[in-house]
Swiss-Prot record:
The gene is holA. The lineage of its organism: Bacteria, Bacillati, Mycoplasmatota, Mycoplasmoidales, Mycoplasmoidaceae. It is an enzyme of class 2 (transferase). Its EC number is 2.7.7.7. It comes from Mycoplasma genitalium (strain ATCC 33530 / DSM 19775 / NCTC 10195 / G37). This is Probable DNA polymerase III subunit delta. GO terms for cellular component: DNA polymerase III complex. One of its GO terms (biological process) is DNA-templated DNA replication. The keyword Transferase applies. Part of the beta sliding clamp loading complex, which hydrolyzes ATP to load the beta clamp onto primed DNA to form the DNA replication pre-initiation complex. DNA polymerase III is a complex, multichain enzyme responsible for most of the replicative synthesis in bacteria. This DNA polymerase also exhibits 3'-5' exonuclease activity. The delta subunit is the wrench that will open the beta subunit dimer. NCBIfam families: holA. Disulfide bonds: none annotated. GO terms for molecular function: DNA binding; DNA-directed DNA polymerase activity.
Length: 297
């Protein structure tokens, strides 16, 4: 028996694709122990004719197993069945059973992104220029499922289209603002510890996030300045090419900031942007110092 585990479901399913390319497997989803008992009770189970992958075996996420669950593992351990568990820390006992092979799908990090993208491209028989691979490594989140989904979209483009950087950028979804939005919200709520955590996380996964963050943040601050004194009716009629509900959310998020403070922060962002361009290696301390200067109670 093989147990494949990890938090990145996309990485697990990439590993399963490799397994299935060498031998046919039938894939099922775990429901309960009875389902597994019924499985190994089948006459052909364990023969060369029938091999199974059982996804999301959630009972293996526990720190200890019941008697029935342990018995189930004992029955399955000498078979070719493959179980998947969507956690980094499954039941520790599986690693002590000699007949069980465990495979850990470690989380992606920025250093492994190029390799991950390359593997997906090979699987999809897709050739991308190094420049586009570099851009994808910075634009996509550390999630193999998302990486596969986005690169699969690129496989639908023509040979000439796939070389058009601007076209590729329009096809790929923009995932960065979601992470950056969490950082801006933490700052405006004076949650400095949380903000520092987001800065560290973004810096570890997106090397040029600081400039993107400042662009996003200054845009929000400008909108906040424009709608600060607007009433709900004015927000409905205002023409800023921005969704009305987003304007309401921005007005609410920045309601404690005076116009003078908003202007001061915008000016500070402009100065910080220049500093970052000249001292890129100091992005994290410069950002944290900026956060402490304006967003502590």
């Amino acid at each position: 028996m093989t147990i494949i585990y990890g938090q990145d479901i996309g990485l697990i399913h990439q590993k399963l694709s490799q397994i299935k390319s060498n031998s046919p497997y039938k894939t099922i989803w775990f429901k309960d122990l009875k389902q597994l008992y019924d499985l190994f009770s089948q006459p052909l189970f364990g023969s060369n004719n029938e091999k199974f992958i059982v996804n999301n075996c959630s009972f293996l996420e526990k720190t200890s197993l019941t008697r029935q669950e342990n018995l189930c593992l004992e029955k399955l351990k000498t078979t070719d069945v493959v179980l998947t568990v969507y956690t980094d820390n499954p039941f520790s006992g599986i690693k002590t059973i000699k007949s069980i092979t465990t495979v850990f799908c470690d989380k992606l990090d920025w250093k492994s992104m190029h390799k991950a993208i390359g593997e997906v491209c090979r699987e999809l028989n897709l050739k991308l220029d190094l420049e586009i691979i570099d851009w994808l490594a910075n634009a996509l989140p550390l999630n193999m499922g998302v990486i596969y989904q986005e690169i699969n979209k690129l496989s639908l483009l023509g040979k000439n289209e796939i070389k058009d950087n601007k076209l590729v950028e329009t096809v790929i979804c923009d995932y960065q603002p979601v992470q950056i939005y969490k950082l801006t919200k933490a700052l405006t709520n004076s949650q400095i510890v949380k903000a520092f955590k987001y800065i560290d996380e973004l810096a570890s996964t997106k090397p040029n996030f600081a400039t993107q963050f400042l662009e996003f943040f200054s845009g929000e601050l400008l909108l906040a300045l424009m709608v600060k004194s607007c009433n709900p009716k004015q927000l409905t009629n205002i023409n800023l090419n921005v969704n009305q509900f987003r304007l309401i959310a921005i007005q609410s998020q920045y309601h404690n900031f005076t116009s003078k403070v908003l202007v001061n922060i915008i000016n500070a962002i402009q100065k910080l942007d220049i500093k970052l361009k000249h001292n890129d290696g100091f992005a994290i301390p410069l950002l944290k110092n900026f956060a402490l200067s304006f967003f502590t109670n």
